[in-house]
Curated annotation (Swiss-Prot):
Protein name: Reticuline oxidase
Gene coding for it: BBE1
A GO-annotated cellular component: cytoplasmic vesicle
PANTHER family linked: OS08G0158400 PROTEIN
Cofactor binding mode and count: Binds 1 FAD per subunit in a bicovalent manner.
Organism: Papaver somniferum
Entry-linked Pfam families: BBE, FAD_binding_4
The protein's Enzyme Commission number: 1.21.3.3
């Protein structure tokens, strides 16, 4: 979900949780014994006390309260490895004792897939694996996958004024899941996705083996950089390429409160600006409707000075009507805090910030052609019917159009103009209306269908949507034809890259230890595995 303002401080606990084993369950005891014998002691088990450390830890990185309800499945164990070796041992023990594994980096899975499952499961929470090592000389960094984007940005800003990284602008998103799905952000038009700038990685496979880029092989290294999180193994760390930024750049964050007609015109003009600006300039927009008026928040980042930024906007988007004081010069690190709605760089380092504590559901689209003015108008009229609905729009173009569709699994490159996200959010006291909210979102999504990508209508795995379908891995009749069933969402997220992802999955995790309802399946039959040699 797009992070928004209204930050609430969260508790900062987490050092070492005492092991507390629930008796009477042989499976639980076997896993506890295995973890302890391998030196993994930092775990807690399911508790009936809602004030226990177990529930504090479960909810600490649960970013969608929709999945906090008592009726939603809970993990039997939450394990917090503190080293590469402990992560390896945790995966080994869970696999040996046949537990379903859920890997949680920041907890931003839109469908709660990092902390829910239909079978007895273990959350492997990566938050203690959040160390970051910056090498300014080589312009690279090693980032443990439990580090949030905010922690990464803070570490870079403390080390250099002339290097940055391209990733999302919500600081509490975990780097493990974000990069695994691609990772779009405010500098993607200049440098591509986060995953495009990964040069090495450490992966723990289902047997607990520790693999670097060379050991995992080209297909698997390609797959983990955009093929989705929680599928290939446990990412211990990424080695990323740091990217040049000026000592001072320019940003703006401006909200326009206007009538629906004027808002429609602004959005209609924005779409032509967003993907055609120089790659050094990105303008994104959030929007919704309150009463009779729409609100549009325009977020801009220019890798240059204020005068140049204002000249470009005055020429390309004069309708926005920005004045001199609305352009602000600051360092790259300060800009990451500013665009997140934070006051200081140091706040980037707080992984427990809560930007919006409402439950939510989202959908995403990509466009390849311009959207007519009347479509924006009607979309805003639909938003006026639902106070909890809003949109987030991003332009592509620039570097995104220059990178080949198969460079990483993320295929939405040349020809893709815009990414639209539709969100509906609601408060706890509105849970009785969930059906109404879901129906509205489906109606909104259906309305946009003629104006977005087609055959198939594509999506983005970091905005995972179970409405598209899913596999119940408990049902053997589903798994026998899993590759074809999964094609329904696999080709929406990855287009023609789906086949290579299946190949990579079969190579690294043939027993499908790492799975969720929309994970990439391995080939199940011997003749299918033999076909890998032909791919």
């Amino acid at each position: 979900m797009m992070c928004r303002s209204l930050t609430l401080r969260f508790f900062l606990f987490i050092v070492l949780l005492q092991t507390c084993v629930r008796g009477g369950d042989v499976n639980d005891n076997l896993l506890s014994s295995c973890l302890n014998s391998h030196g993994v002691h930092n775990f807690t088990t399911l508790s009936t006390d809602t004030n226990s450390d177990y529930f504090k830890l479960l909810h600490a990185s649960m970013q969608n309260p929709l999945f906090a309800k008592p009726t939603v499945s809970k993990p039997s164990f939450i394990v917090m490895p503190g080293s590469k070796e402990e992560l390896s041992s945790t995966v080994h023990c869970c696999t040996r004792e046949s537990w379903t594994i859920r890997l949680r980096s920041g907890g931003h899975s839109y469908e709660g897939l990092s902390y829910t499952a239909d079978t007895p499961f273990v959350i492997v929470d990566m938050m203690n694996l959040n160390r970051i090592s910056i090498d300014v000389l080589s312009e690279t960094a090693w980032v443990e996958s439990g580090a949030t984007l905010g922690e990464l940005y803070y570490a870079i800003a403390q080390s250099t004024d002339t290097l940055g990284f391209t990733a999302g602008w919500c600081p509490t998103v975990g780097s493990g899941g974000h990069i695994s799905g691609g990772g779009f952000g405010m500098m993607s038009r200049k440098y591509g996705l986060a995953a495009d700038n990964v040069v090495d990685a450490i992966l723990i496979d289902s047997n607990g083996a520790i693999l670097d880029r060379e050991k995992m092989g080209d297909d698997v290294f390609w797959a983990i950089r955009g093929g989705g999180g929680g599928v290939w193994g446990a990412i211990y760390a990424w080695k990323i390429k740091l990217l040049p930024v000026p000592e001072k750049l320019t940003v703006f964050r401006v909200t326009k409160n206007v009538g629906i007609e004027d808002a429609s015109s602004l959005l209609h003009k924005w779409q032509y600006v967003a993907d055609e600006l120089d790659e050094d300039f990105t303008v994104s927009v959030l929007g919704g409707v309150n009463g009779n008026d729409a609100w549009l928040m325009f977020l801009g980042l220019h890798l240059g000075r204020k005068d140049a930024a204002k000249t470009i906007i005055d020429e390309k988007f004069p309708e926005l009507g920005l004045v001199d004081k609305e352009f602000q010069e600051m360092s790259w690190g300060e800009s990451m805090a500013f665009l997140s709605g934070l006051d200081t760089i140091s706040e980037l380092n707080n992984r427990f910030l809560k930007f919006d504590e409402r439950a939510f559901k989202t959908k995403v689209d990509f466009t390849k052609v311009s959207v007519p003015l009347n479509v924006f108008r009607h979309a805003l009229e639909m938003l006026s019917e639902q106070p909890g609905g809003f949109i987030a729009l991003n332009g592509f173009g620039g570097k995104m159009s220059e990178i080949s569709t198969d460079f990483t699994p993320f295929p939405h490159r040349k020809g893709t103009k815009l990414m639209f996200e539709y969100i509906i959010a609601w408060n706890q006291d509105e849970e009785s209306k969930i059906g109404e909210f879901s129906e509205w979102l489906a109606k909104f999504y259906d309305y946009l269908e003629p104006f977005v990508s087609k055959e198939p209508r594509v999506g983005y795995v970091n905005h995972i949507d179970l409405d598209i379908g899913g596999i119940d891995w408990r049902n053997k009749s589903s798994t026998t034809n899993a590759v074809e069933i999964a094609r329904n969402w696999g080709e929406r997220y990855f287009s023609s890259n789906y086949e290579r992802l299946v190949k990579a999955k079969t190579l690294i995790d043939p027993n499908n230890v790492f799975n969720h309802p929309q994970s990439i399946p391995p080939m199940m039959k011997f003749e299918e595995i033999y076909m890998l040699k032909e791919l």
